[in-house]
Amino acid sequence: MIKVIVCGILGRLGSEVLAACEKSGDIEVVCGIDASAQIPAEGPPVFSSFCTLLPEADIVVDCSAPSLQSQVLGYCVQKGLPLLSCVTGYTAAQKQLFSNAANQIAIIRCVNMASGLPQYLHMLMETVRVLQVPYAEILETHRIGKKDTPSGTALLIADMLKQAGCETAISSVRRRQARGSHEVALYFASQQIVLRHTVCSAAAYGEGAVPLIHRLMTLRAGLYELP
């Protein structure tokens, strides 16, 4: 049984990771970290911060916020625990801290754990390559309340397109009950192709964490950047 600590366990993503781990059959969430005062009566124990009294664990999954990075990395390095970071919105300086910590522990950074995203990105970049697309527009749509704009996935797509020599613009939309969607319109030779990836339920993110947890258990110290 893989023992996991989930940071940000009471949030939208953290709760989905907890649910997916409980269904997996071989992953146990031994506790959560969350500053919220709404501590649930059932489920694993929830602590307000990292402390020496936390149960023993094999991995930390971080679903919290960039502001908690120092606490998360500090605990993982101190205990020698691998880290799955699902948080977006880090500054360049904070990203460097991941690189520093990766000298001692294995870290997977994944901006979007939906299982269909890697295939979507593959199709997108193959289309750009074959058609030599010079310009693309990214439209990312999420619920009101999402903390970072543009989304981490949109920034990832923009960076991939830039590396392929494709000029890119990003537009962000926030709606009350929006599904997480990334649409890329490719413009070339007086034509347009539109490719879209949509997450219909936040459960997709939690389910995507399970194989990443399994993978993390096999990795040596280092920083592994995934879509």
Predicted regions and their residues:
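C-terminal substrate-binding/catalytic lobe of Rossmann-fold NAD(P)-dependent oxidoreductases
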Residues: 5-7, 12-51, 131-227
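Hydrophobic beta-strand scaffold residues
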Residues: 29, 46, 83-84, 107-109
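Rossmann-fold NAD(P)-binding glycine/threonine-rich loop
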Residues: 73-74, 87-107, 118
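Short alpha-helices
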Residues: 112-123
